Amino acid sequence: MNQEQEITPESAALLRGAMQRRTVLAGAGGVALAAFLAACGASGNGSTPSTTAAAGKDLSATEKKLRWQNWPAYMDKEGGKGSTLTTFEKQSGVDVNYTTEIDDNITFTNSVQQQLQRQQPTGYDIVVLTDWMAGKWIANGWALPLNKENIPNAKNLRPQLVEVPFDKGRNYSLPWMSGFAGIGINKKVFKKLTGKSEIKSIDDLWDPKLKGRITVLSEMRDTMGLIMMSQGKNIGNFTDADFQDALAVLKDKVDSGQVRQVTGNGYLPELESGAIAASTAWSGDVDGNPDLAWFVPESGATYWTDNMLIPALASHKTNAEKAMNFYYDPENAGRLIAGGVTYVTPVPSAKPTVQKLDAELAKNPLIFPSEQFLANTQIFKVLTAEENDNY
């Protein structure tokens, strides 16, 4: 997986030519900026698949295996010794091949799309994708329906996450974690360059003192969402003109060199090392690192969810459902959070376990957000077919 890429003249040209991106992006390969623009045209706005996912033979009864592809920083101890994952393996007898190669939704989906379109196995039994991409998989018939009899703990799902537009009733997906996109800074470097200890707005990223020391996320809904919110727009109900105004800002900052990189999870090592001073950033990546700080802009943060799906033709569907059920047990969900996965758990009843293991962590609004905190967040709207064509 490409962790991050410099904005080359070629990729900058792609941004300048956004209106022609459908033809230009055909040969864009893995350029992060191209992935960003492609995200503008990816939607999954219905909960009924246009085609039925191909179901392969479930070998779970004879093969105690599970291959799980996830994002980095989403498992306590990255699934190693003493983690919740090893507990699941011991309790279930299932050997889990757990990998963290998902850097952004588009890059990962592109890596398996050919198999999915040809109705060939991807080799994965669980993949974790953000709402909008999960919707695309479901709509395209790339995800298998869940057997809820194998997941009785799904009843513990946060009620607000049950009836989502892309999967009403959660027949194909279950949330893994939710989180927020705001602004992360390297405290020492940011203070040295700006003389400030905190950042209050997206506009603060455009300070000339930070030129070339800024990155933005390749997740279009987060970066464009934050910019539109800074312009006073509601990202749950914006117009094409609103989107184009925000895109014009981003174009200008890329063309001027203010923005150094467009990146997925690869921004984090750069932020930790001080190569960059600030970035649009995901809450759980930055929270807990004493050298970094994460801020909700005054205009608000975006709120998103990453979801577990079982790909079409997965070989170990029942084993995958057993893993989902394990992590929806409140005690296991609490151990996962207490182990360092500082995102919003989809299992609010995990809080007593977290309180027992780490009382301070249980007070963290980035894990158990209050209604007041959530009031300053927005969820990016589901794109219509027309908007999909326009963007």
Language-model features and meaning:
Residues 213-219, 223, 227, 231-297:
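Ligand-binding pocket segment of bilobal, Venus flytrap-like solute-binding proteins
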